[in-house]
């Protein structure tokens, strides 16, 4: 069934244990009203899966375009098991949106292949702020 016909917020599958895992979370500083909510939700989910707080490292980068560089830092210089990349790109009147979205998508994909490490793509790409205005409530 197509996901547009399912309320994915209502999915309730059990989380695997993250007790022994280490995570890096890289967060874009641009659109902090959105990315801070995404960060809160990610940390809450990891903690709910048993990940100790000391096994969660958080780094900030200026914008969504730089998420790949932040993820590479975690892959290359730390011992994390996985990375979560969080950002938000809001479409404007220029093609800048397309360039940023394409760049971060390709960058993160290449890093997963290069480092053989899962990098969760938590980047919202939206036409305006309305669809993301509730993210701070989704912890």
Where is each model-derived feature located?
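A short acidic, helix-capping loop that chelates divalent metal ions and anchors anionic groups
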Residues: 92-94, 129-133
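Glycine-rich phosphate-binding loop
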Residues: 66-108
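Short glycine-rich or small-residue beta-strand-to-loop segments that form or flank ligand, phosphate
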Residues: 22-29, 59, 85-91
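Active-site rim loops that border cofactor/substrate pockets in soluble metabolic enzymes
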Residues: 49-77
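N-terminal amphipathic/basic leader segments beginning at the initiator methionine
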Residues: 1-18
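Conserved small/polar residues in nucleotide/adenosyl-binding loops
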Residues: 135-139
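Short, acidic/small-residue loops that bind anionic groups at enzyme active sites
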Residues: 98-125
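Glycine-rich phosphate/diphosphate-binding loop of Rossmann-like nucleotide-binding domains
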Residues: 21-55
């Amino acid at each position: 069934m197509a996901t547009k016909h399912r309320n994915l917020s209502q999915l309730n599958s059990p989380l695997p244990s993250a007790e022994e895992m280490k995570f890096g979370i890289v967060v874009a500083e641009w659109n902090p009203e959105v990315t801070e909510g995404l960060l809160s939700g990610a940390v809450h989910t990891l903690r709910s899966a048993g990940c100790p707080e000391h096994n969660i490292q958080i780094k900030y980068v200026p914008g969504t375009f730089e998420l790949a560089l932040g993820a590479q830092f975690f892959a290359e210089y730390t011992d994390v098991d996985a990375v979560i990349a969080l950002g938000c790109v809001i479409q404007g009147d220029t093609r800048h949106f397309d360039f940023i979205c394409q760049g971060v998508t390709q960058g993160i994909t290449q890093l997963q292949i290069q480092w053989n490490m899962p990098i969760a793509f938590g980047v919202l790409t939206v036409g305006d702020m309305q669809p993301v205005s509730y993210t701070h409530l989704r912890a």
